[in-house]
């Protein structure tokens, strides 16, 4: 009888808490409208742990693509390093896909720099999406939060990495740092490699990372490792002394699994607090 009562009590406790949802601490979701398309984009924002107590402090801002995937991942991976003082605290901002759209169609359209005839989906809105980030997202964050306009980091993966490379080559001063995970250099016959690149005038850090197994030999449709190395070479070619570049191959990682390591190691390289 006691065992039955205990089991019933445990079941009651479980059912009583089953509807409680977990929320990322100090986070909100807002909506911003892109002009002139009038598309609405949800934007996820997380403030650092010290934000409420250090009211005069201006924070670096980490900007992410693919918000539903990247926001919980980067928030979780940076929580302990930031809170324990081994990584600078920062505001995390993730731009999601167009409201009401399928994520795949939104990201393919917004993260690609050219209109690819071979694709059935709409492509080629990278310039427009870059303008949305520059003219709408940045002002909102910097006017409503204590986010730095001189210490911004971009983090993108796959097509998001391609989008970051496009911004690096066309408007490099938008961000101080670029983390390009498994960039889709192959898109539209490697067209990103033919983009006429603007040399950064300010100090810029570029972290390019790719999984060891992102090759056809391991089932990938494209050789992402070679593509990432070609992108590295292009970045080196435009460096006039302002670029600090790091290239990393994530051991044992595929396209599906490389990004968590790429993101946290890239952020540690940029914001890690080194012991003296």
Model-inferred region functions:
Residues 146-157, 178:
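Alpha/beta-hydrolase fold nucleophile elbow
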Residues 156-160, 164:
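Gly/Ala-rich beta-loop-alpha elbow adjacent to hydrolase catalytic centers
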Residues 186-249:
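The feature captures the conserved acid-bearing segment of alpha/beta-hydrolase catalytic domains
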Residues 166-176:
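Conserved hydrolase catalytic core segment
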Residues 4-12:
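Sec-dependent N-terminal signal peptides
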Residues 16-59:
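A domain-start/cap signature at the N-terminus of enzymes
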Residues 174-185:
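A conserved short beta-strand
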Residues 30, 57-132, 136, 140-144:
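Serine-hydrolase catalytic machinery in alpha/beta-hydrolase-like enzymes
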């Amino acid at each position: 009888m006691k065992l039955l009562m205990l089991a019933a009590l445990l079941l009651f406790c479980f059912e009583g808490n089953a509807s409680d949802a977990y929320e990322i601490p100090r986070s909100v979701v807002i909506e911003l409208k892109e002009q002139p398309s009038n598309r609405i984009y949800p934007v996820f924002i997380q403030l650092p742990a010290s934000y409420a107590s250090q009211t005069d402090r201006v924070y670096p801002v980490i900007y992410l693509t693919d918000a539903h995937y990247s926001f919980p991942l980067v928030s979780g991976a940076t929580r302990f390093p930031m809170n324990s003082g081994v990584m600078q605290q920062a505001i995390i901002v993730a731009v999601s896909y167009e409201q009401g759209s399928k994520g795949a169609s939104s990201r393919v359209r917004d993260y690609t720099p050219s209109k690819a005839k071979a694709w059935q989906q709409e492509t080629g809105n990278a310039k427009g999406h870059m303008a949305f980030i520059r003219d709408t997202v940045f002002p909102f964050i910097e006017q409503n939060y204590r986010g730095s306009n001189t210490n911004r980091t971009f983090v993108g993966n796959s097509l998001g990495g391609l989008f970051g490379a496009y911004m690096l080559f066309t408007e490099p001063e938008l961000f101080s740092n670029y983390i390009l995970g498994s960039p889709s250099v192959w898109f539209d016959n490697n067209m990103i490699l033919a983009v006429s690149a603007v040399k950064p005038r300010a100090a810029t850090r570029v972290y390019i990372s790719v999984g060891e197994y992102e090759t056809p030999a391991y089932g990938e449709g494209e050789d992402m490792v070679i593509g990432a190395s070609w992108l590295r070479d292009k970045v080196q070619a435009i460096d006039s002394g302002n670029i600090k570049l790091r290239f990393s191959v994530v051991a044992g990682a595929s396209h599906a699994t490389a990004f968590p390591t790429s993101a946290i190691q890239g952020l540690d390289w940029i914001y890690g607090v080194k012991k003296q």
